[in-house]
Design a protein with these regions (language model features):
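Catalytic donor nucleotide-activated moiety binding site of glycosyltransferases and closely related
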Residues: 71, 75-112, 154
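Short, surface-exposed amphipathic charged segments that create phosphate/polyanion-binding patches used
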Residues: 16-19, 53-61, 100-105, 180-187
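Non-catalytic N-terminal targeting/anchoring module and adjacent flexible stem/linker
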Residues: 211-229
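Short, polar loop motifs at secondary-structure junctions
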Residues: 26-34, 91-96, 152-157
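Catalytic binding pocket for nucleotide-activated donors in carbohydrate/polymer assembly enzymes
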Residues: 100-104, 111-209
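Catalytic core of nucleotide-activated saccharide and alditol-phosphate transferases
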Residues: 1-81
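A generic local structural motif
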Residues: 10-15, 46-50, 109-113, 137, ...
Length: 229
């Protein structure tokens, strides 16, 4: 099993360079899935504990690697401050050895601390990297914890977890509307919608598909299909 977690253009080894050894290749990106003939999975979120703060100390947070988008993210932060909002953006280098190459780079932060700050924010920023069209882990974190999402990824509207009260597309809406958006209550997702984005659901579907293959070999009825993934 091989899973591309980022856009394929960021990987040295492309799908057509992988030996035909019976591996299944998966991606979170629908465009990459179609382009390279890979299996598409909507999400593999691992459910964890935690609860968002009732008294957040910042409006929008972002903790992530540069990936060629740092200048745009920091510029967005300045625009938010000009609107009277309180963003907290920390950019890390793509590799640790690059830490001192740019003055705004911050040391790597443990994921536990990132999640803690995300839960103490009114919203989290998800900024597209080059070649990305699928949703990211940040999107799924927000949906799981009920933290609002600010993003420039228009593809989010194609997903059934999208709700305009939960997701602010800042390239489609004026930034001046962000403050009022943050005041609107988060709309909780239906459990049957959310579960499709969890790793437990994906594993269950793989097992079901394997059982169906065994049944076909035995000449038994196929049962339900897992093609909806």
């Amino acid at each position: 099993m091989l899973i591309y977690e980022d856009p394929i253009l960021r990987y040295v080894i492309k799908p057509d360079q992988i030996p035909a050894c019976g591996y299944e290749a998966w991606t979170f990106d629908p465009v990459d899935a179609k382009k390279f003939g890979l299996n598409f999975v909507k999400g593999l979120y691992i459910t964890e504990g935690g609860q968002k703060s009732e008294t957040p100390d910042c409006d929008v947070c972002f903790f992530g690697k540069d990936k060629g988008r740092a200048e745009e993210i920091l510029s967005l932060g300045e625009r938010l401050r000009a609107l009277g909002l309180n963003p907290l953006f920390q950019i890390m280098p793509d590799t640790k050895v690059q830490l001192h190459q740019k003055p705004y780079y911050q040391p790597y932060i443990p994921f536990s601390r990132i999640r803690e700050q995300m839960l103490n924010s009114r919203a989290q920023l998800d900024y597209l990297q080059q070649g990305q069209s699928g949703i990211s882990l940040r999107t799924l974190e927000c949906m799981h914890y009920g933290v609002k999402l600010v993003t420039n990824n228009p593809e989010i509207e194609r997903y059934d977890i999208y709700h305009p009260d939960n997701v602010f597309l800042f390239e489609k809406r004026p930034l001046e509307e962000l403050a009022s958006f943050l005041c609107v209550p988060f709309v909780q997702l239906a459990p049957e919608v959310w579960e499709q984005y969890t790793i437990e659901y994906w594993i269950s579907t793989l097992r079901q598909r394997e059982q169906q293959a065994c049944d076909r070999e035995k000449g038994e009825p196929r049962g339900k299909s897992a093609d909806h993934l």
